[in-house]
C-alpha cells in the first residue's frame, strides 16, 4: 500500500496560493503535513486556518508567526513589517481560530519511522537553516532519516552520508525535482513556501513524499498573485508584503 504525504509550509495567510496548491496536487496524496506559519503577512488568516482544519491533516505544527498571532509570543524579535502584519492578524483572527493556533504543537514531531517535521530546525523551532553549519547541527539533532523543515521560505535539500554533506536540491529552481532516499543517508528538505517564497521563484512551493517508495517530488505552482496582492492592499497591510509576492523575495 502506497503512503504519500502532501507537504506544505509557510502559507502565511495566502488563500490563493493554498487553494491552487490543493487543486493542482489534489488526489496525489493520502495525508497532509503542515510545517507551520499558517498565518502572518497575508490577508486571509481565517480562511487559511479554516481550510487547513478542513483538510484534517495528519500532523500540523506551529511556526513563529502562529505563536505571535495566537498570543503565545510578543513578536518583539520581528522586524517592523512582520510585527505590524502579525498584530493585524491577531486582531483579525476569530477566537476559535486563535485557539486552534494556540494548541498547535511545536516541532520537531515524528511522522513515522522515516520522517520527522519541524518549522525551523530539529534543535530549535525558531532557528533558521540556511547553510552547511546549520545543516550539520540539524542532522545531529534529527531523529529520523528525513527531516522536513520550513521557515526560510527557500526550497533546498541537504544530504549527509559517509561523513559528507552535500546540497542535493536548490537553492533555486526545484520544480519537478525528484529525490530518492538512500537507506544509508539522512536528508533535510525544505519544499519552499506556499504563500511567500523568498528564493527568487514567486510560484507556490510544495512537495509530495512517497513514504513507501522512499522519495520526494518538489513542486512550484503558479497561482493568482494579483488577487493575493489586492487583498493585502485592501486590508491596509504594508505595501511591501504585496510587492514581494511578485518577486519571490
Model regions and ranges:
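Short, surface-exposed, charged loop/turn segments at secondary-structure junctions
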Residues: 125-134, 159-169
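Active-site-proximal beta-strand elements of phosphoester/diester hydrolases
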Residues: 4-12, 114-121, 188-192
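Short, glycine/charged-enriched secondary-structure capping and boundary segments
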Residues: 20-23, 47-50, 74-77, 131-132, ...
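Active-site neighborhood of phospho(di)ester-bond hydrolases with catalytic His/Asp-centered motifs
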Residues: 8-9, 32-37, 59-64, 146-151, ...
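Active-site environment of divalent metal-dependent phosphoester hydrolases
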Residues: 12-17, 40-43, 65-70, 109-110, ...
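N-terminal active-site segment of His-dependent metallophosphoesterases
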Residues: 1-58
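Active-site neighborhood of divalent metal-dependent phosphoester bond hydrolases
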Residues: 48-49, 55-118, 122-143
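Acidic, His/Gly-rich catalytic cores of divalent-metal-dependent hydrolytic chemistry
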Residues: 162-249
Amino acid at each position: 500500500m502506497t503512503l504519500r504525504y502532501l507537504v506544505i509550509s509557510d502559507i502565511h495567510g495566502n488563500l490563493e496560493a493554498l487553494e491552487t496548491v490543493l487543486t493542482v496536487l489534489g488526489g496525489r496524496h493520502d495525508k497532509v503535513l503542515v510545517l507551520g506559519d499558517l498565518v502572518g503577512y497575508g490577508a486571509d488568516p481565517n480562511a487559511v486556518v479554516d481550510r487547513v482544519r478542513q483538510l484534517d491533516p495528519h500532523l500540523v505544527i506551529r511556526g513563529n508567526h502562529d505563536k505571535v498571532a495566537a498570543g503565545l509570543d510578543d513578536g518583539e524579535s520581528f522586524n517592523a513589517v512582520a510585527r505590524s502584519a502579525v498584530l493585524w492578524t491577531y486582531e483579525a483572527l476569530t477566537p476559535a481560530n486563535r485557539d486552534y493556533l494556540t494548541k498547535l504543537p511545536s516541532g520537531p514531531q515524528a511522522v513515522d519511522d522515516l520522517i520527522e517535521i519541524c518549522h525551523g530546525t530539529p534543535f530549535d523551532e525558531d532557528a533558521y537553516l540556511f547553510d552547511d553549519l546549520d545543516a550539520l547541527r540539524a542532522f545531529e539533532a534529527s531523529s529520523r532519516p528525513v527531516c522536513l523543515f520550513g521557515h526560510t521560505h527557500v526550497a533546498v535539500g541537504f544530504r549527509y552520508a559517509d561523513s559528507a554533506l552535500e546540497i542535493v536540491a536548490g537553492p533555486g529552481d526545484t520544480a519537478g525535482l525528484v529525490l530518492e532516499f538512500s537507506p544509508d543517508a539522512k536528508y533535510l528538505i525544505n519544499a519552499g513556501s506556499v504563500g511567500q517564497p523568498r528564493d527568487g521563484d514567486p510560484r507556490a512551493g510544495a512537495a509530495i513524499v512517497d513514504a513507501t517508495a522512499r522519495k520526494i517530488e518538489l513542486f512550484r505552482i503558479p497561482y493568482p498573485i494579483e488577487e493575493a496582492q489586492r487583498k493585502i492592499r485592501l486590508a491596509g497591510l504594508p505595501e511591501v508584503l504585496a510587492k514581494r509576492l511578485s518577486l519571490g523575495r
